[in-house]
């Protein structure tokens, strides 16, 4: 301990910041005179109530007292991890308001044995009143926001993550998001009964956006998106609810986009992604996937998921409209549904020979060597005149004999590009 005590304050504070609980940080004050006041300057604090058998009142008093004694001019990260809540989060927010916090995390640990679906933090709207002038990063998970007359304002917030949050209604959450004038990164994961049917994201400064809707949302209730983000560069949409759709979108600077959706209503959103350079698609159908005549002229990297029945039609359609594509990856990202039929290859009706004039890299992950898969690989090797590298990674649950059979049946002679290097590997 004497040797550790001789270290510089900055190094010791960094070590204390790694402790899993603020209670452990405060406890170091009894080690020696050297440590007595050191904890008061720790830049990152985690208040973890998720595993302790203490009542919430005792926990909240500890939060209030320890933060009142804290002397650091700025707290880089203040994290409240809660397993059971009685009452509201007024004490937590009140204590946090006494400090200059850059990053604030408030969440219930739903894996805790003491937590339940009814245990949720009700946060006062003083959190959104602009008192946190320095707050640049905010994450809320499994909490309830209540509506009051306090104006919503986050003047310095650049990153906002809202996961399984319940709101007073559409207007409230839309105002909350639009009240962040310098916001650059937004993640919204909706939950059932969140009181939001139309999520509007209207932020001129936003650069990254992730919208997530899981299957537990009510299917018969519409869940729509309105996206007005002229500076957006990175978009991710995960939607397993079948009925959701983007009703309006303004995105002119997209660089990367990921669309993993069950809903066939993708025409509006994909029609706005013509500037993207990297695109991931897992779509249920190619019909009306995006407007006829759209060209992905900037697209250089395409990844297609093979879990849906019509993945092959989606692939061919996008290839037709991507004249500058350089990298193509095919992979099964989700489990197959046994009742769904698999696609069949029909080269004469599906594909013209002028596809893939710029393709240089081709990769297929979870390749099983089916008849259709072999036909698709052979076609790509035959028409990709600039191909430099083709990599096939086998499905990991295939036995050794089947892998050897796949290797022997691989269409090596189909290569049109003499410079193409073939690699066949096993997915372990």
From Swiss-Prot:
Organism field: Arabidopsis thaliana
Domain F-box residue range list: 2-50
Pfam families: F-box, FBD, LRR_At5g56370
InterPro entries: F-box-like_dom_sf (IPR036047), F-box_dom (IPR001810), FBD (IPR006566), FBL13/AtMIF1-like (IPR050232), LRR_dom_sf (IPR032675), LRR_FXL15/At3g58940/PEG3-like (IPR055411)
Gene3D superfamilies found in the cross-reference section: Ribonuclease Inhibitor (3.80.10.10)
Name under which the protein is recorded: Putative FBD-associated F-box protein At5g56390
SMART domains according to UniProt: FBD
Record lineage: Eukaryota, Viridiplantae, Streptophyta, Embryophyta, Tracheophyta
FBD domain span: 344-394
């Amino acid at each position: 301990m004497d040797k550790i005590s001789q270290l510089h304050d900055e190094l010791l504070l960094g070590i204390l910041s790694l402790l899993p609980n603020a209670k452990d940080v405060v406890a170091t004050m009894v080690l020696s005179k050297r440590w007595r006041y050191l904890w008061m300057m720790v830049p990152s604090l985690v208040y973890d109530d998720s595993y302790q058998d203490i009542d919430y009142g005792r926990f909240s008093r500890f939060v209030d007292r320890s933060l009142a004694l804290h002397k650091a001019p700025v707290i880089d990260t203040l994290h409240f991890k809660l397993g059971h809540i009685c009452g509201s989060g007024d004490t937590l927010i009140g204590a946090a308001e006494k400090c200059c916090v850059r990053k604030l995390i408030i969440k219930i640990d739903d894996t805790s044995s003491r937590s339940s679906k009814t245990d949720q933090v009700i946060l006062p709207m003083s959190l959104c009143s602009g008192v946190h002038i320095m707050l640049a990063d905010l994450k809320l998970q499994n909490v309830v926001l209540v509506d009051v007359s306090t104006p919503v304002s986050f003047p310095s917030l650049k990153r906002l993550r809202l996961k399984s949050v319940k709101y007073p209604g559409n207007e409230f959450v839309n105002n909350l998001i639009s009240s962040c004038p310098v916001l650059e990164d937004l993640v919204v994961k909706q939950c059932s009964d969140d009181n939001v049917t139309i999520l509007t994201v209207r932020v001129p400064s936003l650069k990254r956006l992730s919208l997530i809707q899981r299957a537990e949302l009510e299917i018969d209730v519409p869940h729509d998106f309105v996206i007005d983000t002229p500076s957006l560069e990175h978009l991710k949409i995960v939607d397993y609810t079948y009925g959701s759709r983007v009703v309006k979108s303004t995105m002119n600077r997209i660089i990367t986009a990921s669309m993993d959706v069950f809903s066939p209503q993708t025409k509006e959103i994909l029609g706005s992604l013509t500037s993207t350079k990297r695109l991931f698609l897992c779509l249920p159908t190619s019909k009306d996937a995006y407007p006829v005549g759209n060209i992905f002229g900037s697209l250089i990297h395409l990844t297609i998921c093979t879990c849906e029945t019509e993945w092959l039609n989606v692939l061919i359609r996008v290839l037709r409209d991507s004249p500058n594509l350089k990298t193509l990856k095919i992979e099964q990202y989700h489990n197959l549904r046994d009742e769904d039929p698999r696609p069949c290859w029909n080269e004469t009706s599906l594909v013209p020979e002028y596809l893939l004039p710029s393709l240089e890299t081709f990769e297929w992950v979870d390749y099983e060597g089916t008849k259709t898969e072999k036909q698709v690989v052979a076609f790509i090797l035959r028409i990709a005149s600039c191909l430099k590298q083709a990599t096939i990674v086998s499905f990991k649950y295939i036995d050794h004999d089947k892998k050897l059979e796949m290797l022997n049946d691989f269409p090596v002679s189909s290569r049109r590009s003499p410079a193409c290097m073939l690699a066949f590997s096993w997915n372990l």
